[in-house]
């Protein structure tokens, strides 16, 4: 730990503190002293220009004051978690508020019925104009209606978890938050949870501390059905993440990405070299690769669950074929899934891979200045095509067989020296085979995405992606 390292590096430091008064050393609260040292070190690291952005953010998070999250059942940033277990024990029904939380005057709660076209359109427009955009306000997610139905209407969805806030006077939808039920495994424990998503506020509402109210209200509704754990993601560091991920972007249409400002602009030889290095063949190379069909659902479920369970400590569990059919059967403009027929076992699948479509709107033309709807092009700037969106594919789930039957010869076992090292050797060989297979599948996914007209292929450094 950082504090132990500091004391070992300067053993006289602690002695000087303990000997600086006549108070017996035993009366000092060593835990508080450690926390103070940790805070000082974190404060210093948060301002260190030599540290990475992630290191600075994590350090800043340790000393940040979160008025809302400090009241919630989440670990504190400085807290060391040693054991698995629920942060929030189940509540008795009489402990759960039956009525919604009070909203500021002029606002009212509502349910958004995703299956009603007019309400779906309201929700879509709220996201389109107010949801996630990059730090420079150049791009914003542009969800299709069909994508939102896919995301919010899985088997077992709860209409009460599609929570909106309207203006009491105009009835305009000004805020939204949603949840869907998910089954998760945390090591060897299966837990029913809520996955929270699409927290969105109208830009005019962001100074009124509405987000905590939305989170509390959807939490209340989740509690009412006996669920007391939830998972969610955030674009900023909040206390305390189970995991942090970084996006990686693989260009499929480098010229367009440069013209829109998504990628750094290159010219001449640099551009030609980049385009050449990103070249992809027109056909996939994995034998037996084809689009997923309805008849594949059962095998994909077994393949995916087995892959997740043998590779990761925290994972979703797909309990029914209906879930697999919903999330993975190909939907035009939403999700694409490909399976591989096993050449060694006719009728069986050896692998699958999927990606989903989420375009981004281009908010600012490169080289242009926006003002009252007029784009003024600076002198000497070559006009660029008026792109309105970037077509992005996102790597979704994948799975490959994990039972490769790797064995060691007697000579190899003796060379390992112990049973433990022999098992490690087998595991390393299996991992190498899985890595090679997944790399081949991912390359084919790039080829298929490019052929489908995507401009960029995105993925997070999670699962085996890293």
Describe these PLM feature segments.
Residues 2-294, 315-324, 425-432, 436-440, ...:
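An N-terminus-focused feature that recognizes amino-terminal "leader" regions
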Residues 297-307, 312, 331-340, 344:
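Beta-propeller domains
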Residues 342, 354-357, 397-399, 460-463:
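Active-site proximal loops enriched in glycine and acidic residues that flank catalytic Cys/His/Asp
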Residues 176, 180, 191-203, 365-377, ...:
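Conserved acetyl-CoA binding element of GNAT-fold acetyltransferases
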Residues 159-179, 322-366:
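Conserved beta-hairpin
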Residues 162, 252-262, 273, 332-340, ...:
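Aromatic/basic-lined ligand-recognition segments
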Residues 296-309, 349-352, 360-371, 378-387:
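Membrane-interfacial loop- and helix-cap regions that link adjacent transmembrane helices
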Residues 304, 325-328, 335-337, 396, ...:
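Generic hydrophobic alpha-helical scaffold/packing signal
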